[in-house]
Amino acid sequence: MVYFVSMMMIGLILGLMGVASNPSPYYAALGLVTAAGVGCGLLVSYGGSFMSLILFLIYLGGMLVVFAYTAALAAEPYPEAWGDWSVLMYVGIYLTGLVIAGKYFLVGKWGDSWAGVEELSSFEVVRGDFGGVALLYSLGGWMLVLSGWVLLVTLFVVLEVTRGLSWGTLRAV
């Protein structure tokens, strides 16, 4: 199980690197799907099955719509691939920053425990995952409403930007 979780963590870093290097919107969308899938798989391996399902649906439902509009706006006949030198430079900068931040911030703090939600010392009647969902809807209800409004405003902004060549924001000058 440790090997499986380690491979999923490496996959999460590679997916986030694909989003951060962003050679083309097509590859950034692929990196986002990879990062969302592997990140939710990590949550499942630590015992958070319901929250991982909700996060996966939010990522794929909300963010990929924005990436679809971005890909439609920035349609390139010859997009940059991950093997180009400029993209490899961004990947190198991202990995260097990740290693430096990991050595500086994470020295001895979280590396000692791989315990999941169900491996805690206390005996609980309700799983930790469902307790978190209850807190999300009770104390975090205002954050859900705020997130819904932000997604709605984002949708209207994207629709306004892509409305038309003569009326929208992206018109030929």
UniProtKB/Swiss-Prot annotation:
The chain crosses the membrane at residues 1-21, 28-48, 53-73, 87-107, 139-159. Pfam families: Oxidored_q3. Its EC number is 7.1.1.2. Keywords: Electron transport, Membrane, Mitochondrion, NAD, Respiratory chain, Translocase, Transmembrane, Transmembrane helix, Transport, Ubiquinone. GO terms for cellular component: mitochondrial membrane. InterPro entries: ComplexI_Subunit6, NADH_UbQ/plastoQ_OxRdtase_su6, Nuo/plastoQ_OxRdtase_6_NuoJ. Its main location: mitochondrion. GO terms for molecular function: NADH dehydrogenase (ubiquinone) activity. It catalyses: a ubiquinone + NADH + 5 H(+)(in) = a ubiquinol + NAD(+) + 4 H(+)(out). Core subunit of the mitochondrial membrane respiratory chain NADH dehydrogenase (Complex I) that is believed to belong to the minimal assembly required for catalysis. Complex I functions in the transfer of electrons from NADH to the respiratory chain. The immediate electron acceptor for the enzyme is believed to be ubiquinone. This is NADH-ubiquinone oxidoreductase chain 6.
